[in-house]
């Protein structure tokens, strides 16, 4: 008695087609998520509503007598700092001095590089920034990357520490 032949080529074709569709779907989903992280309506509205001073360079925004440049580029702390200085020789990564500045920056970015580390306890690698800025459960965490370098991130039940982040 002859066994019916199994069409392995047909199965293989279906599996390959399924894998291709899955890869395309995943790649598309990752692009959508990345765009939402970089270009969110709240960021765009905040930037448009920000006061532009004449003494700030073109495309920079003003807050609390500081000119701020926002970038969508992902860079290391050192690359971000070098880019700041290349944009304007007198510029550097921002120094957060008040809870209001922290709140303003939070409305612009979820994470960013800053240029000062004095707000951290020098003996521990992690510390909360501006404890009176933690109202409504919004806690920002700083991670010491280098002796004079910290990265600020929103703590939302978990925090992912990366070596690259947006700089501002």
From Swiss-Prot:
Q: Which residues lie on this side of the membrane: Cytoplasmic?
A: 1-9
Question: What species is this protein from?
Answer: Vaccinia virus (strain Copenhagen)
PANTHER family found in the cross-reference section: C-TYPE LECTIN PROTEINS (PTHR22800), NATURAL KILLER CELLS ANTIGEN CD94 (PTHR22800:SF252)
Per UniProt, residues of the C-type lectin domain are 63-168
- The answer to whether keyword Transmembrane helix applies is yes
Statement: the UniProt record of this protein carries the keyword Ligase: no
Please provide one cellular component term from the Gene Ontology annotations of this protein.
membrane
Which parts of the sequence lie on the Extracellular side of the lipid bilayer? 31-168
Q: Can you tell me where the transmembrane regions are? A: 10-30
InterPro entries registered for this protein in UniProt: C-type_lectin-like (IPR001304), C-type_lectin-like/link_sf (IPR016186), CTDL_fold (IPR016187), NKG2/CD94_NK_receptors (IPR050919)
Q: What is this protein called?
A: Protein A40
Q: What's this protein's family per the entry?
A: Belongs to the poxviridae A40 protein family.
Subcellular location per UniProt equals: Host membrane
Q: Which UniProt keyword terms apply here?
A: Early protein, Host membrane, Lectin, Membrane, Signal-anchor, Transmembrane, Transmembrane helix
């Amino acid at each position: 008695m002859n066994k019916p032949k199994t069409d392995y080529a047909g199965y293989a074709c279906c599996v390959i087609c399924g894998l291709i569709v899955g890869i395309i779907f995943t790649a598309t989903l990752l692009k959508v998520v990345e765009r939402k992280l970089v270009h969110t309506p709240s960021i765009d509205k905040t930037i448009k509503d920000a006061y532009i001073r004449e003494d700030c360079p073109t495309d920079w925004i003003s807050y609390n007598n500081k000119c701020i440049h926002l970038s969508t580029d992902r860079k290391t702390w050192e690359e971000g700092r070098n880019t700041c200085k290349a944009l304007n020789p007198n510029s550097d990564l921002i120094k957060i001095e008040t809870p209001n500045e922290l709140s303003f920056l939070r409305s612009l970015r979820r994470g960013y590089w800053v240029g000062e580390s004095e707000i951290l306890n020098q003996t521990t690698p992690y510390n909360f920034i501006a404890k009176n800025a933690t109202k409504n459960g919004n806690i920002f965490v700083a991670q010491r990357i280098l002796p004079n370098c910290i990265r600020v991130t929103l703590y939302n039940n978990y925090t992912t520490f990366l070596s690259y982040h947006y700089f501002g």
